[in-house]
Amino acid sequence: MHSTNLLLEEPIRMASILEPSKPSFFPAMTKIVGTLGPKSRSVDTISSCLKAGMSVARFDFSWGDAEYHQETLENLKVAIKSTKKLCAVMLDTVGPELQVVNKSEASISLEENGTVILTPDQGQEASSQVLPINFAGLAKAVKPGDTIFVGQYLFTGSETTSVWLEVSQIKGDDVVCVIKNTATLAGSLFTLHCSQIHIDLPTLSDEDKEVIRKWGAPNKIDFLSLSYTRHVEDVRQAREFLSKLGDLSQTQIFAKIENVEGLNNFDEILQEADGIILSRGNLGIDLPPEKVFLFQKSALHKCNMAGKPAVVTRVVDSMTDNLRPTRAEATDVANAVLDGSDAILLGAETLRGLYPVETISIVGKICAEAEKVFNQDLYFKRTVKHVGEPMTHLESIASSAVRAAIKVKASVIICFTSSGRAARLIAKYRPTMPVLSVVIPRLKTNQLRWSFTGAFEARQSLIVRGLFPMLADPRHPAESTNATNESVLKVALDHGKVSGVIKSHDRVVVCQKVGDSSVVKIIELDD
């Protein structure tokens, strides 16, 4: 296993830890995905979330209908315009998730050593004696002695709000369980997780397909979070489905690894998916506690070497109800960054948490501090060694741009790209400075109308560590041919100056295509 990329060669002066951090336009290189819900769906709150550092908005269809989420999305669009901050949209599928709907929303008290029946009869009311579930095949999937976890949707892991059950007997379609700990289940939706048991339900359900078709396609979602990805075929089938929905052929698929099946098929899934979400909540139930860190470090390393974004979930659960994270959570966020995470995904913390904006802000600050002690030199050498020789042309250009930027202490790398691939390859080498990804739009036609590409590519870089996109004006050349022409490069430099990442006399590394050649050049700015 590869060690954490922590810079320890230079002794840190302990008193320097107490010095205030310098303000920055970019809160952190590590991106933050926020789940929008009851506590975070107003225009004002979303605007504050964007300013605090949220770059991807997640819409979770495990609860709420399309109309509810559409209202939230419209508020997001207003917030984007008012803050002038780009934000991508992620749709999270339900998949083969086992659920208990608590129609009355009354709290359900369960006592240790008592019994409760899990039944597929959804006509029954949820109570301390019976929990109706959405899966008729549970009695055939489990056996006496198996463990089942039940918690509030997006559970925080608190033993007082979640319960462990042990299967004691099967009665027809019903499963009788012994309660292992006293708990009170609160809320309208509970989820069940059967430890290391195969659930015979499709990864992309008919309900998921309907939501994608009727909500995802009209809204041109940037990412599809494929819940409970178990096999590489799950990703292929989802991609085939998206390819038939017009613009969604460009939507990136992030495979959500939530159980042992996904873990066992991780390498094949990684090759096919556009990115990976490590769903540590459910996976933490399937794995022994002492093995969770090993999975995280190994999975993140594999994602890094493949150059695919990796997202870590469940980091500051306690901030759902508290203004500050625990010491363990603060350390966990930092370690996720040092392990190689591209983004941190916040679930309950922003969906129903009391402090969504503060949570995003604090997580961003922790990420920024961790990035300062990331051993980029060690990481760079390891990545180059893994890529091997001969490198592809694009890989060689990307690694050279990063090495040059570090050697000359450049303040930023500017990369001109159409597909976004060149910028993502630069980000793969984890430069210590921001990468300004200037997306050059391309004109395309279907014989009936013209349209520009580029918006998808720009937004999809919002989940990649260190990439900050801007859409270029297609009327301007990539570089001016004379002093009077306004070039895209000048616009990019001006954007960097306004953002505060570029100052007078700074050095900037530019990566662009000139004719058929790819060029890396270093420019030094005048006053």
Curated annotation (Swiss-Prot):
Statement: the UniProt record of this protein carries the keyword ATP-binding: yes
InterPro entries: Pyr_Knase, Pyrv/PenolPyrv_kinase-like_dom, Pyrv_kinase-like_dom_sf, Pyrv_Knase-like_insert_dom_sf, Pyrv_Knase_brl, Pyrv_Knase_C, Pyrv_Knase_C_sf, Pyrv_Knase_insert_dom_sf
Residues that coordinate or bind K(+): D60, S62, D92, T93
Binding site for substrate: R58, K256, G281, N282, T313
The UniProt record lists the keyword Cell inner membrane: no
Residues where Mg(2+) binds: E258, N282
Chief place where the protein resides: cytoplasm
GO biological process, one term: glycolytic process
Catalytic reaction annotation: pyruvate + ATP = phosphoenolpyruvate + ADP + H(+)
GO molecular function: ATP binding; kinase activity; magnesium ion binding; potassium ion binding; pyruvate kinase activity
Lineage: superkingdom: Eukaryota
Residue numbers binding ATP: D60, F61, S62, W63
NCBIfam families, A to Z: pyruv_kin
PANTHER family: PYRUVATE KINASE
UniProt family annotation: Belongs to the pyruvate kinase family.
Assembly and interaction partners: Homotetramer.
Name of the molecule in the record: Pyruvate kinase 2, cytosolic
Source organism per UniProt: Oryza sativa subsp. japonica (Rice)
